[in-house]
């Protein structure tokens, strides 16, 4: 498991109050983890802060699963 993956999982667990075992790469933020639209926006902001990066709104809308977030961050991390 990469450092990015660990941090993303920790942020999701903290924000959505779910068990780490529920946070898989395939888990959908809304369908599987119970996030509403505000939770999702706040998660993206938390990812931006944690990884010191910007996630444009059009890209954030495409990030629907934990794996999507990990892949996006790893690809765009400076």
UniProtKB/Swiss-Prot annotation:
Domain (Carrier): residue spans on this chain = 1-77
Q: Any idea which UniProt keywords this protein has?
A: Cytoplasm, Fatty acid biosynthesis, Fatty acid metabolism, Lipid biosynthesis, Lipid metabolism, Phosphopantetheine, Phosphoprotein
Compartments in which it is found: Cytoplasm
Keyword tRNA processing assigned: no
Any one Gene Ontology MF annotation carried by this entry is:
acyl binding
Q: Could you describe the post-translational modifications of this protein?
A: 4'-phosphopantetheine is transferred from CoA to a specific serine of apo-ACP by AcpS. This modification is essential for activity because fatty acids are bound in thioester linkage to the sulfhydryl of the prosthetic group.
Identify residues that carry O-(pantetheine 4'-phosphoryl)serine: 37
Q: Which GO terms describe its biological process?
A: lipid A biosynthetic process
Q: Tell me the superkingdom of the source.
A: Bacteria
* Pathway(s) where this gene product acts: Lipid metabolism; fatty acid biosynthesis
Q: Which GO terms describe its cellular component?
A: cytosol; membrane
> Which InterPro entries has this protein been placed in?
ACP, ACP-like_sf, PP-bd_ACP
User: Any idea what job this protein has?
Assistant: Carrier of the growing fatty acid chain in fatty acid biosynthesis.
Q: Which family does it belong to?
A: Belongs to the acyl carrier protein (ACP) family.
Q: Could you tell me what this protein is called? A: Acyl carrier protein
Organism of origin is Porphyromonas gingivalis (strain ATCC BAA-308 / W83)
What is the organism lineage in this UniProt record? Bacteria, Pseudomonadati, Bacteroidota, Bacteroidia, Bacteroidales
